């Protein structure tokens, strides 16, 4: 008795029914592939008439701007090269192959135009054919291979980091001339719909142009499609890490002239600023394009700052030399007094304290009168004071007062007593040796104090001259810093307006 098998599950039947069309479609594509490539030769140009060219529609899509090497003058890009042409050998009727209208085949199986990058600097000139091409039943072939190109580009870093670059990419057939391949540009510029924004460069525009050139090597005319890539460097990174620190260093250099000379730290501040700038330059050397063709704008600014700081050190040393001058080492010329003590302070609205100027004549008059009195005291003969020999000009107030008293006293004594009494009284007025010695000592001290005050006044004048020089260079360096910075960084704007 036979074994009765149970009927297959419904799910199994449904799965088989679903796989039948897939298998049928795969079989149709297999038959179509065999039909298309049975006698196909990928070396022969796909034209029915040899005299006709193959029309190639060409477009470049920018995927990413990888890098711009300023030193080696190379631009690295990630591109998609869209190429569309018609191959009459790759036509079929969809009805014969279960409605199959499109088919993807390996690119090495079909004929392809040998379009290369003429100005390639490194790597392969031609794209890799590992990607597949899309075939349409009408014979239209669409091939979009991705490629990373390193193209040569003339980099002008004059206005770095505010520079604009124009890099060209020239595509064309290496083997086929105009009679064999006719290149047609799709659109008027590079396709940037799938562009991945770069952190350093911004693409302004990328127009494309078609050229026909006759080279020296050949008689034929060759076509090419050239894209001009206008790019602008994004300066934010360099502004924060290069320009702003240099501006701060320049500002510290200006403050050197505002620092008082008496503090003794002017040269220390100058040297510290110079050392900080030197270390800063060593750190950023690799950031700046190392080229000897032109001096980049940021290099000019760093050189300007270095000269700025060095010049401030030289001027500071000169100012300190003026500040510490004394009457024993230098004599102030008349023109220095006229220019630096009278003219320039008024021009720069500097006001010198008036107390010193008012007290100086009083001090000189006081010491002059006291020394005159001490000279009268030091006379050994009281008769000279009595007769008024040293006091005829009225400069000795003490002698004049003493002479009047002695004259009055002598007159009274004359009326009341004999001449011998008068001589006795006058003899008592003579100074003792101890008093004379004390007067000489006081006179010496007074003369020294007068000389010290005169020397201090001259030293104060030299210090004020140094202060005036400091103030002059303070304003000069502020103007140079502002105008120099503005002049350097306005050059890119002016150059862009000219172009």
UniProtKB/Swiss-Prot annotation:
Transmembrane portions of the chain: 245-260, 263-279, 302-320, 469-487
Membrane disposition: Multi-pass membrane protein
SUPFAM superfamilies: Neurotransmitter-gated ion-channel transmembrane pore, Nicotinic receptor ligand binding domain-like
InterPro entries: Neur_chan_lig-bd (IPR006202), Neur_chan_lig-bd_sf (IPR036734), Neur_channel (IPR006201), Neuro-gated_channel_TM_sf (IPR036719), Neuro_actylchol_rec (IPR038050), Neurotrans-gated_channel_TM (IPR006029), Neurotransmitter_ion_chnl_CS (IPR018000), Nicotinic_acetylcholine_rcpt (IPR002394)
Post-translational modification: Ubiquitinated; by STUB1/CHIP and thereafter degraded by the 26S proteosome complex.
Predominant cellular place of this UniProt entry's protein: membrane
Keyword Repeat among UniProt keywords: no
Activity regulation summary: Activated by a myriad of ligands such as acetylcholine, cytisine, nicotine, choline and epibatidine. The heteropentamer CHRNA3:CHRNB2 activity is blocked by alpha-conotoxins ImI, ImII, PnIA, GID and MII. The heteropentamer CHRNA3:CHRNB4 activity is blocked by the alpha-conotoxin ImI.
Residue spans, topological domain Extracellular: 26-244, 280-301, 488-499
Domain of life: Eukaryota
Catalytic activity: K(+)(in) = K(+)(out); Na(+)(in) = Na(+)(out); Ca(2+)(in) = Ca(2+)(out)
Gene Ontology cellular component list: acetylcholine-gated channel complex; cholinergic synapse; endoplasmic reticulum; Golgi apparatus; postsynaptic membrane; postsynaptic specialization membrane
Glycosylated residues, chain numbering: 49, 166
Location relative to the cell: Synaptic cell membrane; Cell membrane; Endoplasmic reticulum; Golgi apparatus
GO BP, sorted A to Z: behavioral response to nicotine; excitatory postsynaptic potential; locomotory behavior; regulation of acetylcholine secretion, neurotransmission; regulation of dendrite morphogenesis; regulation of membrane potential; regulation of muscle contraction; regulation of smooth muscle contraction
Record-listed Phosphoserine modification sites: 407, 410
Protein's UniProt keywords contain Transmembrane: yes
Tissue note: Expressed in the brain (at protein level).
Signal peptide: 1-25
Keywords (A to Z) from UniProt: Cell membrane, Disulfide bond, Endoplasmic reticulum, Glycoprotein, Golgi apparatus, Ion channel, Ion transport, Ligand-gated ion channel, Membrane, Metal-binding, Phosphoprotein, Receptor, Signal, Sodium, Synapse, Transmembrane, Transmembrane helix, Transport, Ubl conjugation
Binding positions (Na(+)): 265
Cytoplasmic-side positions: 261-262, 321-468
Listed GO MF terms: acetylcholine-gated monoatomic cation-selective channel activity; transmembrane signaling receptor activity; transmitter-gated monoatomic ion channel activity involved in regulation of postsynaptic membrane potential
Its job: Component of neuronal acetylcholine receptors (nAChRs) that function as pentameric, ligand-gated cation channels with high calcium permeability among other activities. nAChRs are excitatory neurotrasnmitter receptors formed by a collection of nAChR subunits known to mediate synaptic transmission in the nervous system and the neuromuscular junction. Each nAchR subunit confers differential attributes to channel properties, including activation, deactivation and desensitization kinetics, pH sensitivity, cation permeability, and binding to allosteric modulators.
Family of the protein in this entry: Belongs to the ligand-gated ion channel (TC 1.A.9) family. Acetylcholine receptor (TC 1.A.9.1) subfamily. Alpha-3/CHRNA3 sub-subfamily.
Name of the protein: Neuronal acetylcholine receptor subunit alpha-3
Organism expressing this protein natively: Mus musculus (Mouse)
């Amino acid at each position: 008795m036979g074994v009765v098998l149970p009927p297959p599950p419904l799910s199994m039947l449904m799965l088989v029914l679903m796989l039948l069309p897939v298998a049928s479609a795969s079989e149709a594509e297999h038959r179509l592939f065999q039909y298309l490539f049975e006698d196909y030769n990928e070396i022969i140009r796909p034209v029915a008439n040899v005299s006709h060219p193959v029309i190639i529609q060409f477009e470049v899509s920018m995927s990413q701007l990888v890098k711009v090497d300023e030193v080696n003058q190379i631009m690295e890009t990630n591109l998609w090269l869209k190429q569309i042409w018609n191959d009459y050998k790759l036509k079929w009727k969809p009805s014969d192959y279960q409605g199959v209208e499109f088919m993807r085949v390996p690119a090495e199986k079909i004929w392809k135009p040998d379009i290369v990058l003429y100005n390639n600097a490194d790597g392969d000139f031609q794209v890799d054919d590992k990607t597949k091409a899309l075939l349409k039943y009408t014979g239209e072939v669409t091939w979009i291979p991705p490629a990373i190109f390193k193209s040569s580009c003339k980099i002008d870093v004059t206005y770095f980091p505010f520079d604009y670059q124009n890099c060209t990419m020239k595509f064309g057939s290496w083997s086929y001339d105009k009679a064999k391949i006719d290149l047609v540009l799709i659109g008027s510029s590079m396709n940037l719909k799938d562009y991945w924004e770069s952190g350093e460069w911004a693409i302004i525009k990328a127009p494309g142009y078609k050229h026909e050139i006759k080279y020296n090597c050949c008689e034929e005319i060759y076509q090419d499609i050239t894209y001009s890539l206008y790019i602008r460097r994004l300066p934010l990174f360099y502004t924060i890490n290069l320009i702003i620190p240099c501006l701060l260093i320049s500002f510290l250099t200006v403050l050197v002239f505002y620092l008082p000379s008496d503090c003794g730290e002017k040269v220390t501040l100058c040297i510290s600023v110079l050392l900080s700038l030197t270390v800063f330059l060593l750190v950023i050397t690799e950031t700046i394009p190392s080229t000897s063709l032109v001096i980049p704008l940021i290099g000019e600014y760093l050189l300007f700052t270095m000269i700025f700081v060095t010049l401030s050190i030289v001027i500071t040393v000169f100012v300190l030399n003026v500040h510490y001058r004394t009457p024993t080492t230098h004599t102030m010329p008349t023109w220095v007094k006229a220019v630096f003590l009278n003219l320039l302070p008024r021009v720069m609205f500097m006001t010198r304290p008036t107390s010193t100027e008012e007290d100086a004549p009083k001090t000189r008059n006081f010491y002059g009168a006291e020394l005159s009195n001490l000279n009268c005291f030091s006379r050994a003969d009281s008769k000279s004071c009595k007769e008024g020999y040293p006091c005829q000009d009225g400069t000795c107030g003490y002698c004049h007062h003493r002479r009047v008293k002695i004259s009055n006293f002598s007159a009274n004594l004359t009326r009341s007593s004999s001449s011998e009494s008068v001589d006795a009284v006058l003899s008592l007025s003579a100074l003792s040796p101890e008093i004379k010695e004390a007067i000489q000592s006081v006179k010496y001290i007074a003369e020294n104090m007068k000389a010290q005050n005169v020397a201090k006044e001259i030293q104060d004048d030299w210090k004020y001259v140094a202060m005036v020089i400091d103030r002059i260079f303070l304003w000069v360096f502020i103007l140079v810093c502002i105008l120099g910075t503005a002049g350097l960084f306005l050059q890119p704007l002016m150059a862009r307006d000219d172009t």
